[in-house]
């Protein structure tokens, strides 16, 4: 019977066989163990599970939000057009199942409706903030469940906000600054200059510089492209200088030479959507979908959601430090809070018992006093009744005596009458 031998790890000396921090030794293996296939397992699992990406589009009505999304994914996702006659800002939410090769993407697009159409625009950002917080709250409640299933949970948190800026060519509107200021701590903001084909190339660059200057001066934090990852560093370095992206959307195909391209046909020529000399659409698409989608999701979870979670748990009485300012785990916090809640329940239960017993004693005293009053009243009435009975008995005896005397007198009267009648008869007989 063949024996199965295990390949033993051997230490590779480096710099005099030094050890790393925490006594972690760098080792290599001889032979095949199989854990080199872990990346393949993750890829297979991710493909099987599919991916989720949630986009929030904020901009005035008719600025081209739906058209740009259709252009990004090269399909018609939305047919109906929004009206300009909304009394309040609303949100339209649509979820789509997209597939490219063997990769499935569940895409959720949230678009503002009626944004910027009101006379009083001061609170236009509030429905957007409320929606983002509601998605954070839903995820937090799922996390706090005893039997939670985040693997199967549909993550509806907003991963990126495409903020559409009107191509005025001058500066940002007060509404833009107010909204982005209230959103920058909750979502990854990517500013876009919509309908960039309405501005000349020189004016467009001036407008970009003006926008970035206003964002910085107002302390508005937009999404910072990561440059610390090797795969994305070079691409992001070349793109970061283009912010805000000047974009044009179109799903129509026009003929340029002998080929059909997506673009817009004007009397003066053709604007090609995917021509980098005409607009920044290709740069935006590559940055958003090809390079940084996972980073946007990771930053949403580790920064924006964690900030919301921390503030929410603080309001609930949870902290991430102990009495001596030492960091503690969430499990320790939960157990301490659970014990505190249990002790509080015990105290409140004891207080309720004491209050109940006190009220019982008070009621018993009230009942005893009422019982005594009733007993005294009963005795008084009983005494009155007995006195009445005594008087009636005396009256009865008196009446009975009077009746006896009456019958005696009656009998005597009857005897006298009988005697008189007899004497009268004798006198008559004697006369005869």
UniProtKB/Swiss-Prot annotation:
Q: What is the effect of changing residue 333 to T?
A: Found in patients with teratozoospermia; uncertain significance; sperm heads are malformed and contain vacuoles; chromatin packaging and structure is abnormal with an increase in fragmented DNA; decreases sperm filamentous structure formation; loss of SEPTIN14 and ACTN4 localization to cell filament structures; no effect on interaction with ACTN4
Q: Which GO terms describe its biological process?
A: cytoskeleton-dependent cytokinesis; neuron migration; protein localization; protein localization to perinuclear region of cytoplasm; spermatid development
What are the alphabetically sorted keywords of the record? Cell cycle, Cell division, Cell projection, Coiled coil, Cytoplasm, Cytoplasmic vesicle, Cytoskeleton, GTP-binding, Nucleotide-binding
Highest taxon of source: Eukaryota
Chain ranges of the Septin-type G domain: 49-315
Q: Where is this region: G3 motif?
A: 111-114
Give the transmembrane ranges: none
Tissue specificity statement from the Swiss-Prot or TrEMBL entry:
Testis-specific (at protein level).
Q: Where is this region: G4 motif?
A: 194-197
Q: Which GO terms describe its molecular function?
A: GTP binding; GTPase activity; molecular adaptor activity
Give me the ranges of the annotated region G1 motif. 59-66
Any coiled-coil regions, as ranges: 332-412
> Quick one: where's region Required for interaction with SEPTIN4. Required for migration of cortical neurons during corticogenesis?
369-432
Query: Subunit composition?
Result: Septins polymerize into heterooligomeric protein complexes that form filaments, and can associate with cellular membranes, actin filaments and microtubules. GTPase activity is required for filament formation. Interacts with ACTN4. Interacts with SEPTIN9. Interacts (via C-terminus) with SEPTIN4.
Name of the protein in its database record = Septin-14
Organism of provenance:
Homo sapiens
